[in-house]
Amino acid sequence: METTIPPRWQTVRAGLLTAHLTRSGGGVYSSVRQLARMLDAAPGIEVDVFGPGRLGDKDVAEWSPLPLRTAPTLGPNFFSFAPGLLRRVLEADLNLVHLHGLWMHPSAVSLAFTRRTGKPHLVSPHGMLDPWALGNSSWKKRVAAAVFEKENLKRAACLHALNAAEAGSIRDYGFAGPVCVIPNGVEVPPADQPRPAAPWWTKATPEVKTLLYLGRLHPKKGLPALLEAWRRLDPGLRKEWRLLIAGWDERGHQVALRRMASMLRIEATVTFPGPLFGADKKAAYHHCHGFILPSLSEGLPMAVLEAWACGKPVLMTPQCNLPEGFETGAAQRIEPEEKSIAGALTDFLSTDDAQRECMGAKGRALVLERFSWPVIAADMAAVYRWLAGHGAKPASVTEQ
């Protein structure tokens, strides 16, 4: 006699599809990599990762032990066209595809997967449908929308929003299907974990405190306004602090920022160490005295969650979509313009260490309560089971 396996015990094979497979992919890369690892450890979920490009050994190692299936690219980098990628996805016998990011060739692959197999795909825009993001390089996005992206979103079984603000942007773009709201998660180091060795920039002047920015050097991050605000600070206060702007360059923005720091005559207290990964990144978080993100547009910034996880106080804009940071006292609000940033910096840098440490402790408590990966992965696994027909619609899903 044949035994029927209850749906909740059936394995769901999910393909995570993204153009952001390398460390230069910033917050999308970090969040997708951690989500993939946590989902693969969830009961009844198997994960393969797909994307365009040839990865170096260091990037491949970052995804281990997950299967990483890539296809070589042709043409300009901004589109990530990989002719063999669809074949890799179709060969994997997946129950569903989960696309991360928009406007690039992987979107066309997720659409083709659903058309060819009749199986569902889920889309995580990662803030790419926010008004500011839509207006940036808008002509390229209009072309992509006309050719494949609007149809890709229309045919999606569900869209994933990181927060209520992004869910609103998704609806404003015209998507009428189900939306699940699940935030990014973050790894929280144990409280008794030894601090990493001090980074090089602290050794020459250990008495100088560090305000850290870590992320892409891109116009949307609001860094020119931050430099202007830094210039407005009292020179005596500036001597007690260094502004560390760490990250990978996009579109030559780092050259413009360095030139601006020189023109403003603040280069003595502003450091550009380049991109930081692995142990260097951990050291930057652990040895800074505060973190700042003056961004004009975000989905849900991993960098802020990582700073909180290390117990660091944060200055950020409302556009970071983490209002709970302001509500709990874990973050100080700034607007993305120099006067607001300068005023907030004066208050923040002048306050005593105990107050800043109290803010940081509130941030760590916040991520432990609401942004830990086991909880986030369990919520996403429930969405996968529902889409694959192996479970009921989760509470995270709403319909218009």
Annotate each predicted stretch with a short phrase.
Residues A331-K339, D347-D353:
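Conserved acidic donor-binding segment of nucleotide-sugar-dependent glycosyltransferases
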Residues S30, Q34, K209, Y213-R232, ...:
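A conserved mid-protein helix/loop that constitutes part of the nucleotide-sugar donor-binding site
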Residues A354-E369, D379-A382:
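A short, well-ordered alpha-helix in the C-terminal region of glycosyltransferases
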Residues P313-T317:
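Short hydrophobic beta-strand element within catalytic cores of glycosyltransferases
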